[in-house]
């Protein structure tokens, strides 16, 4: 079965948490190149240099980029060192972030793993958004006429002792089609999903 468009007609209104809990949210694309070894950091191999383009950003209305060098750590994490404009000061500022990889597990008996991207770009209503699923994780962000909404879901043991999707975070009061990605069978790249008042485009869909 192939679905060109899907309409979700029932949406349960669940108030979100206070936006004061969101320090920063963004979504977009990233690219990586290798740079020569930095002698000041005692790294023998070329260092990955990553650049993130923020297509949607809770702190800015226009496009934003940040970039940094990625240094593998002995415990398996990766230390990112870079610089970007500090939203609080408007000045270019150095920063450090520590990253950790997570497994992209399966949610089905056949051990199939899914990766999907939904994108919203409604210029008439000043609405932009992106919802992404990788394996057992779904999260998204939307900016609707200046209002920010974010959600995160994880496939984990529920209170009933069985695996199920659990919402870990919801801030803001608009609607994100996270639940649509729980059952992607029949969806295809290039299709559309109507959720609430908006049509979301299925930009990417993979399974392995």
Report the location of each language-model feature.
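Lipid interaction determinants
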Residues: 1-25, 35-208
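Catalytic phosphate/metal-binding cores of nucleic-acid and nucleotide-processing enzymes, i.e., regions
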Residues: 29
